[in-house]
């Protein structure tokens, strides 16, 4: 290959130009290391002093590592690795290198890339003597690539290109400095490889081109001299940019003595990734592109804990990366679920899910007020008449008029606990009906006033009231026909054995029939208007017992008439009437349904 053959020619040229005592590198033995002072004292008398600052150079080889078959040249001076512990930092900077040995013939060079550990040691003025000035200039000139367009300045001090990111510490500036013309110089780090890296693959940092060496040969950069501008060399259809912006800053290897002394020092080879392009030396444009090149140099690795990590590379923007970034920026959204509203049951069972009745009508009201439909289908005109009482207050309703007439005629007192006006008032009837304390769901005696009356083709719906409250009820249509002019709002009804219809514990209704009516105190009739109640007994029973019927029929009227006379006491007559009503209510119903039995018993003949 042309590139490797050029490197061989450069090596042969340098080896042939060397004096008899050639500089060779020998691997460190397992015995204890010598001190830097003793080691440098052995090296000092071998070569004349030079005023040029020199960095350790790694000479490239054209083949894979091989073992050294011939011993090193006679009279050669060996450089041994020295382990230096810095008192200021306390950390040991280690680097891997290769032992580079040159044969005396100069035709073929073999490098044994065996792992050895070397240190970068710093010496004072006159401690190290390098090659002759002219020979070193020739060696530098032969290693540069003319086609790449990158020509480092070769003055009395060799140029060195350093990454800008090496200047981390403001006190310890990591710029390359030029040795003084008086002859003071410093020794650069001697780079050797621990194990070879046979090939390098192109990455984004090198522009996609293979790099023949990942270890940079950095020289000292003269103070105040400008950094060479980046130049481009087209190789195999691609452009390789040679400049500081292509360098990936690595982990610098520095001499521990330079930390404590504060003198200008050289940055050693960097330890970037395999994609590092520090001081890339690409092939000339006339050379053919190389797919993969064996690495004559190996990237040294630093194990120091005080150096910084390599800079992160810019990620390649892909669709998957964009999706990941957008997914992290989004707020997590829960999957929309259809809201299932739990249906609450008003009571257990499927009927509890039925909707509410919006009309607000009770079943009892519908049963009472809705007329029955005739079988022929023709509906009669629904006639309703709602009449309300004209009195506005309880005192006006019950302090005068028919209510006062009824109390004075019967000599009743509402405050008396034994009077039926108190024991069977509307409040007490509703309470006993709810507690089911009414005998046979009937009220023995009761006096109520009509508050409102709603007439219909059937029975009339009435609202009854007394001084304690109000109660709903119905009036039979027979009473509406016989007492049409008397059944008006404000009239007082004296009732007995009134049935109470209780469809629920809260709803109770009075059913007034002709048999329940005792007397009506109306607004138009006056005090002397009395009504005879209907005959409670059947005709057959009345015919068989003619003496019983007048007594039963006349006794209520007699008690009411005696109430008009002051000398007579109504209290004595009323209990007898109440007892008679109680006896009649206790009679069995068969007593009224079998009139033939009474006649048979009266005559003494068997039935």
Swiss-Prot record:
- For the modification Phosphoserine, the affected residues are 30
The residue ranges crossing the membrane are none
Molecular function GO terms recorded: single-stranded DNA binding
Q: Name one GO biological process term.
A: DNA damage response
Keywords attached to this entry: Chromosome, DNA damage, DNA recombination, DNA repair, DNA synthesis, DNA-binding, Methylation, Nucleus, Phosphoprotein
Entry-annotated residues carrying Asymmetric dimethylarginine = 281
GO CC, sorted alphabetically, is:
nucleus; site of DNA damage
Q: Where in the cell is it found?
A: Nucleus; Chromosome
| Major localization class | nucleus
Give the induction note: By E2F1 and serum stimulation.
Compositional bias of kind Low complexity: 295-308
**What Pfam family does this protein match (any one)?**
HROB
Sequence ranges of Polar residues compositional bias? 27-49, 92-108
Annotated region Disordered: the residues are: 25-49, 84-108, 196-308, 531-581
Quote the biased-composition stretches of kind Acidic residues, using this chain's numbering.
570-581
Q: How does it assemble?
A: Interacts with MCM8; this interaction is necessary for MCM8-MCM9 helicase complex recruitment to DNA damage sites. Interacts with RPA1; this interaction associates HROB with the RPA complex.
Protein task: DNA-binding protein involved in homologous recombination that acts by recruiting the MCM8-MCM9 helicase complex to sites of DNA damage to promote DNA repair synthesis.
Q: What name is this protein filed under?
A: Homologous recombination OB-fold protein
- What is the species listed in this Swiss-Prot or TrEMBL entry? Rattus norvegicus
Gene (UniProt): Hrob
């Amino acid at each position: 290959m042309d590139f490797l053959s050029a490197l061989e020619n450069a090596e042969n040229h340098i080896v042939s130009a060397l004096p008899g005592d050639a500089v060779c590198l020998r691997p460190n033995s397992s015995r204890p290391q010598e001190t830097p002072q003793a080691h440098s004292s052995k090296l000092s008398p071998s070569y004349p002093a030079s005023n040029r600052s020199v960095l350790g150079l790694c000479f490239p080889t054209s083949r894979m590592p091989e073992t050294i078959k011939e011993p090193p040249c006679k009279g050669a001076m060996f450089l041994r690795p020295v382990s230096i512990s810095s008192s200021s930092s306390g950390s040991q900077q280690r680097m891997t290198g290769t032992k580079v040995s040159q044969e005396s013939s100069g035709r073929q060079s073999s490098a044994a890339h065996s792992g050895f550990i070397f240190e970068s040691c710093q010496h004072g003025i006159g401690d190290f003597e390098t090659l002759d000035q002219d020979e070193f200039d020739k060696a530098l000139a032969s290693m540069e690539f003319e086609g790449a367009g990158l020509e480092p300045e070769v003055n009395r001090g060799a140029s060195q290109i350093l990454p800008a990111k090496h200047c981390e510490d403001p006190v310890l500036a990591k710029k390359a400095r030029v040795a003084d013309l008086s002859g003071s110089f410093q020794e650069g780090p001697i780079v050797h490889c621990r194990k070879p890296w046979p090939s390098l693959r192109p990455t984004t940092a090198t522009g996609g081109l293979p790099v023949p060496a990942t270890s940079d040969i950095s020289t000292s950069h003269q103070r105040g001299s400008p950094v060479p501008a980046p130049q481009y060399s087209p190789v195999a259809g691609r452009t390789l940019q040679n400049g500081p912006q292509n360098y990936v800053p690595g982990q610098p290897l520095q001499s521990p003595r330079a930390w404590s002394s504060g003198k200008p020092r050289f940055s050693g080879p960097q330890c970037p990734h395999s994609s590092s392009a520090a001081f890339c030396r690409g092939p000339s444009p006339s050379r053919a592109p190389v797919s993969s090149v064996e690495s004559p140099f190996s990237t040294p690795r630093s194990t120091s804990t005080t150096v910084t990590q390599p800079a992160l590379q810019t990620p390649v923007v892909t669709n998957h990366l964009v999706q990941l970034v957008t997914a992290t920026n989004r707020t997590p959204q829960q999957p929309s679920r259809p809201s299932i509203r739990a249906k609450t049951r008003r009571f257990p069972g499927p009927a509890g899910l039925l909707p509410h009745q919006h009309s607000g009508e009770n079943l009892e009201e519908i049963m009472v007020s809705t007329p029955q439909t005739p079988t022929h289908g023709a509906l009669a005109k629904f006639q309703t008449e709602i009449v309300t009482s004209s009195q506005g207050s309880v005192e006006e309703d019950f302090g005068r008029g028919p209510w006062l007439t009824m109390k004075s005629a019967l000599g009743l007192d509402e405050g008396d606990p034994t009077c039926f006006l108190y024991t069977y008032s509307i409040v007490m009837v509703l309470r006993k009906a709810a507690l089911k304390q009414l005998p046979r769901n009937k009220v023995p005696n009761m006096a109520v006033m009509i508050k409102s009356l709603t007439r219909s083709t059937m029975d009339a719906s009435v609202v009854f009231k007394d001084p304690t409250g109000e109660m709903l009820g119905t009036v039979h249509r027979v009473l509406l026909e016989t007492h049409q002019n008397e059944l008006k709002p404000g009239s007082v009804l004296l009732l007995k054995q009134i049935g109470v219809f209780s469809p629920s514990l809260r709803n109770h209704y009075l059913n007034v029939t002709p048999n329940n009516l005792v007397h009506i105190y109306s607004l138009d009739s006056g005090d002397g208007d009395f009504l005879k109640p209907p005959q409670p007994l059947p005709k057959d029973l009345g015919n068989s017992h003619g003496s019983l019927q007048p007594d039963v029929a006349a006794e209520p009227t007699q008690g009411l008439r005696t109430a008009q006379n002051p000398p007579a006491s109504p209290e004595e007559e009323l209990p007898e009437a109440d007892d008679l009503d109680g006896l009649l209510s206790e009679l069995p119903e068969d007593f009224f349904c079998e009139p033939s039995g009474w006649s048979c018993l009266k005559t003494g003949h068997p039935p």
